[in-house]
C-alpha cells in the first residue's frame, strides 16, 4: 500500500489500460472463468462506416457493465464483438469517396471486383478505428475473435439459413409493389424504412376523369401526379354516400362531378380557386356500390399510347371497391396505379389488372411523352397537361411525411418489381407468441414489439447491389427452375467450373459459377445480394458457427431496433429453429443534446465520445451515462451533470486517499481480527455496504442500471464520505496500535474494497487502480479476478433504521443552525427530542453530540406555550351548523389538558365528542429556541451562547485556519509544525487541544515560513483579528 495523491481520471485510464495490456488481464479473466456457468451474449453490430457517436458509446458501456458484472460473478461469458460490414452503409460511403454517381459507374468506371475490394478495405479500416474508440471507453469484448459477416464461414451460414427456409417452403419469388431507392437502384424492406419518414412539400392535385358512357366526371386526389400516366383503376368505398354535384361555370356551361358527399364542400372550396365556378348543387346521392363497374376515359390517354392498349382490357379504367378508401381527405375516390403502391398492387391483383410500372431502376419513365424523365421532374408537366385538357380541378402544395432511403436519404418510390421474400406471414403468429416469452426491459417493450410484428409483411430479402452476401439461388435459363445452395462444399460439388477460387464467395467470383439443371439447361446465379439486416439477423448462431439454437441470455440496443435487429434475428431463428433467439432483451433510448434536440452536424451540437473522455476520463462518462436517467429513456447529454459525476468520483477518491494515507502512516496491515473491536458506526457502515451490494446485484440482474448507479452515488456521497468518514476521523489520530483506530482502519479497508468490487463494472479503471494499491499478496492480481460476494452476516436492518433517525436529527440540527446563523464550530448547549425515540437516542446520542456539536440532549415533550387550532374542515363534515358551539366547547378546555386527554383517544366536552383529528396543537417557541421538524417529531435547539461556547467555537475556528495553511504549504499529514498565534488568548488546555489537532507546538517566537491574518466573527457578533505564523519543525 502506497500513499495517494489527487487524481486525474484521464491519466488514470491510460495507466490502468497499460497494466491490463501488459498483464493480458482480459484473457486471464476469461481463462479463470472457463469452467464457470456459461453466459451467452450477442453483440448488436455497429456499422463500420465511421467514428462512433455518443449513442454508440452508451450502448457499448451498457453492454460492458453487464458483462463485467457477470464475469465477477464467475460466469464464463461468451462475449464476441460484432460488426456490420456489408450493405448500403458501406457502399454509399465508398461511392462518395470515389465520386461514383450510379450503379452503372460502378461497373464501367471502377469495376465490380475493385468496388468490392474498396468496400472491404473501407469496412476493415473503420473497424480498427472504432475498436480503438471502444477500448478507449474501457470496453472488454472478444475483439480478437469478433464476428464479421464478410468472412466466408459467416456468409455460408446465411446460405444454410436460406436453404432451410426453402426446404420449409418459406422462400418465394414474387412480383410485388414495394420501396425502391432510385439513387441506390435497389429495393428495400419495410423495416429499413421505419423511422425514415421525413416531412416534404409535394403537389396536391385534384383531377376529374370523364366517365366513358356519360358526360359525368369522377374526381380523384393525389400527391404524386407522376403516377397518373400509369393509372389503371379508381376505387370507391361501397358503403359511403357519393354525391352527383352539378357544377355551373361563369361561361354558362355545366358539368357533373362525383364526390363523396361528406367531402363535397371541402373539394368545391378548393375547386373554386382554380375554376370560374358560379355555383354548385347536389343533384342526387348514391351509395358507392352503385358506382362499381363504371368505366372512365383515362385522362392522359393521348399522352401514353400504352394506356390505349390497356383500355381494351375488360376491367382496366374501371371503378372498383376498396376498403382502404376513407373520408379523411381527398374526394372519397382513390386513383389506383398497381405498379406504384402496395394497396394499388393488391387491388389490381384482385381484379386481374396488369401490373404497369413504366419506370427504370433510376426512376425514369420508360413510356409515354415523358419517357426518359425522372418521375419527380414530371409533376409540373403532368399538371400543365391536365390544365390544357381542362381536367384539373385544383392544384396546390401539401406538407406530409414521406419515406426516404435509410442510407442515402433520397425520397423513395413505390415500384412493382420481382423480389425474393421470406414468407413471414406464414409464421407470424408463432413469432408473436415466442416474443411474448422474452424478458423485456422495460416490460412495456413487449407490447411495442408484438404490435410491431403484427403489422409486418413478408420480408423482401433481395437487394440489387454488390457488397453483401450473394443470394445462393441458381435459376435455369431453359425451364426457370431454381435451386438454393446451402454451403460452399455443395456449390463446389454442383459447379460446372472446377477451378474457381471460392475462398471468398462475394461477387463477382461466385457469379462465374454455373450449375446444370435437371432438364439439362444452364443455371446462373440470380445477381442479387441479401438484405444487410439479414446479415445481422444471423448473429445469434452464425457468430459462433452453430447450426443449433443457442439463445442469448442478454441483448440490448437502441429503441429504433425494436422492429429492426430485435425482429430480424428473431425472424431468422423462427424460420430455422421455430423459436426466438434471445431470453432477455433491453431497449435503451437515444442521446440528445441538453435541450432535447437530436445531435447533428448541421446543428453543430454533436458531442464526440473521444472529446469527452479526453476531458473527463472514461469512468466519469461511463458512470454519467448509466446514472443520468433510466436507460430506456432518451438521454439529454449535459456537461454540468458530467461535472457533478466527476465531483462525486473525486469525493470517492478523496475518501480513499484519506484512508490509505493514514493506513500507510501507521503501517496498517488488514486483519479480520480487528472486526472484534468495531463500534456502532463501523457496524452500521459494514451493514450499509453489504445492503448496497445486495441492491446493486439485484439491479444489475434486471438490469436496472439507474438503480445500480443511484445506489452507489448515494452511498459514496451520503453514507461514506459525509457521514462515516466524519464519524471516525478523530479515531485516525489515536495511538498507532489503539484497537479503536485499528478497527476503524479495518472497516475502512473492507468498505473500500467492497465498494470498488461493486463499482468495478461501471468504473473499471478507478476500481482497478484502487484495488492494485490496497490488495494484499494473497489476493487475485486483478479486481476482475476477484469474485463479488455479499456478507449477509454484516447486514443489520435495525441498526440502519436507527442510524437513519440519528442522521435525520443531525440534519435537522444543521438546518436549525443555518436558520439561526449559528455555525457548526460553536457548540449548542442543549437540544430537546421527543420521547418516542428515546431508545434510539440513548444508544446513539453520542453521535448526535459529536456530529451536531451538542453538549446536552433532553428527551421529553417540549414545554412551550401550547395553542389549539380547530380543524374546521373536519368539524364541518360532522357537526355542520353546530360548528361554532363545538369550537366554543374546545376553547373551554385548557390546551395542555385537552392535549393530554386526546392522547388516550376521543374526549367528550359539553356533550360533543372531540377526536384528535378535529384539532391541531401548535407550540409557541421562545426566541432562544429554534424548532425543526423531522419524521419522528421536532428537534428543539437552544441557541443561547455563553463564554464557554464562544471559546470552544474559536478553538475550532483557529484549528480550521491552521489546517488550511498546512494544506497551502503542502505538508505531509504527520509533519510537525511550530505555531505562533496572536489576537486570541486561550487557556493551556485549549492550546494543547489545538496543538494536538494540527500536529503542532505553540511557541513565543519562530522563523516564520508562512503567515496569514484572519478576521473571525462569532455568531454573537464579536470580532477577533488574529495572526498565525507557521514554521516547519526541521
From Swiss-Prot:
Catalytic activity: tRNA(Ile) + L-isoleucine + ATP = L-isoleucyl-tRNA(Ile) + AMP + diphosphate
GO cellular component: cytoplasm
Residues spanned by motif 'HIGH' region: 46-56
Positions bound to ATP: 601
Entry cofactors: Zn(2+)
EC number: 6.1.1.5
Chain location of the short sequence motif 'KMSKS' region per the record: 598-602
Keywords: Aminoacyl-tRNA synthetase, ATP-binding, Cytoplasm, Ligase, Metal-binding, Nucleotide-binding, Protein biosynthesis, Zinc
GO BP: any one term: isoleucyl-tRNA aminoacylation
Broad EC category: ligase
GO MF annotation terms: aminoacyl-tRNA deacylase activity; ATP binding; isoleucine-tRNA ligase activity; tRNA binding; zinc ion binding
Alphabetical list of HAMAP family matching this protein: Ile_tRNA_synth_type2
Family named by the database record: Belongs to the class-I aminoacyl-tRNA synthetase family. IleS type 2 subfamily.
UniProt free text on domains: IleRS has two distinct active sites: one for aminoacylation and one for editing. The misactivated valine is translocated from the active site to the editing site, which sterically excludes the correctly activated isoleucine. The single editing site contains two valyl binding pockets, one specific for each substrate (Val-AMP or Val-tRNA(Ile)).
Entry function: Catalyzes the attachment of isoleucine to tRNA(Ile). As IleRS can inadvertently accommodate and process structurally similar amino acids such as valine, to avoid such errors it has two additional distinct tRNA(Ile)-dependent editing activities. One activity is designated as 'pretransfer' editing and involves the hydrolysis of activated Val-AMP. The other activity is designated 'posttransfer' editing and involves deacylation of mischarged Val-tRNA(Ile).
Protein name: Isoleucine--tRNA ligase
Gene that this polypeptide is encoded by: ileS
Amino acid at each position: 500500500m502506497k500513499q495517494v495523491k489527487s487524481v486525474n481520471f484521464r491519466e488514470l485510464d491510460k495507466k490502468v489500460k497499460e497494466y491490463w495490456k501488459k498483464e493480458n488481464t482480459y484473457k486471464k479473466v476469461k481463462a479463470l472463468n472457463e469452467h464457470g456457468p456459461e453466459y451467452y451474449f450477442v453483440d448488436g453490430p455497429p456499422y463500420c462506416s465511421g467514428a462512433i457517436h455518443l449513442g454508440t458509446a452508451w450502448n457499448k458501456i451498457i453492454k460492458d457493465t453487464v458483462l463485467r458484472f457477470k464475469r465477477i460473478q464467475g460466469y464464463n461469458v461468451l462475449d464476441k464483438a460484432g460488426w456490420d460490414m456489408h450493405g448500403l452503409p458501406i457502399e454509399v460511403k465508398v461511392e462518395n469517396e470515389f465520386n461514383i454517381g450510379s450503379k452503372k459507374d460502378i461497373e464501367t468506371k471502377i469495376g465490380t471486383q475493385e468496388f468490392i475490394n474498396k468496400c472491404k478495405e473501407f469496412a476493415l479500416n473503420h473497424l480498427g478505428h472504432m475498436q480503438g474508440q471502444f477500448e478507449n471507453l474501457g470496453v472488454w469484448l472478444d475483439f480478437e475473435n469478433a464476428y464479421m459477416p464478410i468472412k466466408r464461414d459467416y456468409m455460408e451460414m446465411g446460405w444454410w439459413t436460406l436453404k432451410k427456409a426453402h426446404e420449409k417452403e418459406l422462400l418465394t419469388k414474387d412480383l410485388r409493389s414495394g420501396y425502391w431507392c432510385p439513387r441506390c437502384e435497389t429495393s428495400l424492406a419495410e423495416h429499413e424504412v421505419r423511422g425514415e419518414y421525413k416531412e416534404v412539400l409535394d403537389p396536391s392535385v385534384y383531377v376529374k376523369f370523364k366517365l366513358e358512357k356519360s358526360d359525368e366526371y369522377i374526381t380523384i386526389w393525389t400527391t404524386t401526379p407522376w403516377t397518373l400516366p400509369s393509372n389503371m383503376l379508381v376505387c370507391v368505398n361501397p358503403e359511403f354516400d357519393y354525391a352527383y354535384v352539378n357544377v355551373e361555370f361563369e361561361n354558362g356551361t355545366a358539368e357533373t362531378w362525383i364526390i363523396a358527399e361528406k367531402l363535397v364542400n371541402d373539394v368545391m372550396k378548393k375547386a373554386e380557386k382554380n375554376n370560374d365556378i358560379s355555383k354548385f348543387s347536389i343533384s342526387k346521392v348514391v351509395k358507392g356500390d352503385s358506382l362499381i363497374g363504371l368505366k372512365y376515359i383515362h385522362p392522359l390517354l393521348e399522352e401514353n399510347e400504352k394506356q390505349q392498349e390497356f383500355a381494351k382490357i375488360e376491367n382496366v379504367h374501371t371503378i372498383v371497391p376498396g376498403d382502404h378508401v376513407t373520408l379523411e381527405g381527398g374526394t372519397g375516390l382513390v386513383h389506383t396505379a398497381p405498379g406504384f403502391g402496395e394497396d394499388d398492387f393488391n387491388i389490381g391483383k384482385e381484379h386481374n389488372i396488369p401490373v404497369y410500372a413504366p419506370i427504370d431502376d433510376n426512376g425514369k419513365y420508360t413510356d409515354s411523352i415523358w419517357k426518359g424523365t425522372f418521375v419527380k421532374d414530371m409533376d409540373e408537366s403532368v399538371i400543365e397537361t391536365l390544365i390544357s385538357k381542362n381536367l384539373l380541378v385544383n392544384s396546390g402544395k401539401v406538407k406530409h411525411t414521406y419515406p426516404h432511403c435509410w442510407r442515402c436519404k433520397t425520397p423513395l418510390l413505390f415500384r412493382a418489381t420481382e423480389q425474393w421474400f421470406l414468407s413471414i406471414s406464414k409464421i407470424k403468429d408463432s413469432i408473436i407468441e415466442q416474443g411474448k416469452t422474452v424478458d423485456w426491459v422495460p416490460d412495456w417493450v413487449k407490447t411495442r414489439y408484438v404490435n410491431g410484428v403484427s403489422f409486418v409483411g413478408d420480408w423482401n430479402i433481395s437487394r440489387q447491389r454488390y457488397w453483401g452476401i450473394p443470394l445462393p439461388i441458381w435459376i435455369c435459363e431453359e425451364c426457370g427452375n431454381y435451386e438454393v445452395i446451402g454451403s460452399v462444399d455443395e456449390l463446389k460439388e454442383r459447379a460446372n467450373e472446377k477451378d474457381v477460387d471460392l475462398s471468398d464467395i462475394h461477387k463477382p467470383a461466385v457469379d462465374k459459377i454455373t450449375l446444370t439443371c435437371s432438364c439439362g439447361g444452364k443455371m446462373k446465379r440470380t445477381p442479387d445480394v441479401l438484405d444487410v439486416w439479414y446479415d445481422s439477423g444471423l448473429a445469434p448462431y452464425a457468430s459462433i458457427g452453430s447450426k443449433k439454437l443457442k439463445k442469448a441470455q442478454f441483448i440490448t440496443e437502441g429503441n429504433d431496433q425494436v422492429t429492426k435487429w430485435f425482429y430480424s434475428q428473431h425472424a431468422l431463428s423462427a424460420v430455422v429453429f421455430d423459436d426466438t433467439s434471445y431470453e432477455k432483451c433491453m431497449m435503451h433510448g437515444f442521446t440528445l443534446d441538453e435541450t432535447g434536440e437530436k445531435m447533428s452536424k448541421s446543428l453543430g451540437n454533436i458531442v464526440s465520445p473521444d472529446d469527452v473522455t479526453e476531458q473527463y476520463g472514461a469512468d466519469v462518462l461511463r458512470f454519467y451515462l448509466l446514472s443520468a436517467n433510466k436507460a430506456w429513456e432518451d438521454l439529454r447529454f449535459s456537461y454540468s451533470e458530467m461535472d457533478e459525476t466527476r465531483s462525486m468520483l473525486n469525493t470517492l477518491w478523496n475518501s480513499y486517499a484519506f484512508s490509505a494515507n493514514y493506513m500507510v502512516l501507521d503501517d496498517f496491515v488488514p486483519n479480520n481480527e480487528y472486526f472484534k473491536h468495531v463500534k456502532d458506526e463501523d457496524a452500521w457502515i459494514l451493514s450499509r455496504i453489504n445492503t448496497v451490494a445486495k441492491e446493486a446485484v439485484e439491479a444489475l440482474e434486471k438490469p436496472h442500471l439507474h438503480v445500480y448507479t443511484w445506489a452507489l452515488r448515494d452511498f459514496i456521497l451520503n453514507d461514506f464520505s459525509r457521514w462515516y468518514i466524519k464519524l471516525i476521523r478523530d479515531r485516525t489520530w489515536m495511538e498507532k496500535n489503539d484497537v479503536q483506530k485499528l478497527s476503524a482502519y479495518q472497516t475502512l479497508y473492507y468498505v473500500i474494497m467492497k465498494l470498488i468490487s461493486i463499482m468495478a463494472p461501471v468504473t473499471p479503471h478507478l476500481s482497478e487502480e484502487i484495488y492494485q494499491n490496497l490488495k494484499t499478496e494473497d489476493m487475485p492480481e486483478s479486481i476482475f479476478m476477484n469474485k463479488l460476494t455479499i456478507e449477509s452476516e454484516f447486514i443489520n436492518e435495525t441498526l440502519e433504521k436507527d442510524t437513519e433517525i440519528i442522521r435525520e436529527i443531525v440534519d435537522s440540527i444543521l438546518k436549525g443552525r443555518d436558520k439561526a446563523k449559528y455555525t457548526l464550530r460553536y457548540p449548542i448547549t442543549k437540544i430537546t427530542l421527543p420521547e418516542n425515540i428515546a431508545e434510539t437516542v440513548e444508544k446513539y446520542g453520542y453521535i448526535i453530540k459529536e456530529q451536531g456539536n451538542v453538549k446536552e440532549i433532553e428527551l421529553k415533550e417540549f414545554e412551550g406555550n401550547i395553542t389549539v387550532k380547530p380543524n374546521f374542515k373536519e368539524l364541518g363534515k360532522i357537526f355542520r351548523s353546530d360548528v361554532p358551539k363545538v369550537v366554543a366547547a374546545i376553547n373551554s378546555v385548557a390546551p395542555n389538558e385537552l392535549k393530554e386527554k386526546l392522547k388516550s383517544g376521543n374526549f367528550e366536552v359539553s356533550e360533543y365528542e372531540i377526536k384528535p383529528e378535529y384539532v391541531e396543537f401548535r407550540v409557541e417557541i421562545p426566541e432562544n429556541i429554534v424548532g425543526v421538524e423531522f419524521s419522528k417529531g421536532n428537534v428543539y435547539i437552544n441557541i443561547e451562547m455563553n463564554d464557554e461556547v464562544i471559546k470552544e467555537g474559536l478553538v475550532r475556528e483557529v484549528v480550521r485556519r491552521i489546517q488550511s495553511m498546512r494544506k497551502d504549504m503542502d505538508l505531509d499529514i504527520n509533519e510537525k509544525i511550530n505555531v505562533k498565534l496572536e489576537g486570541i488568548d486561550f487557556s493551556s488546555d485549549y492550546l494543547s487541544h489545538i496543538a494536538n489537532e494540527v500536529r503542532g507546538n505553540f511557541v513565543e517566537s519562530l522563523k516564520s515560513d508562512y503567515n496569514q491574518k484572519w478576521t473571525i466573527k462569532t455568531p454573537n457578533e464579536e470580532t477577533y483579528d488574529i495572526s498565525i505564523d507557521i514554521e516547519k519543525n526541521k
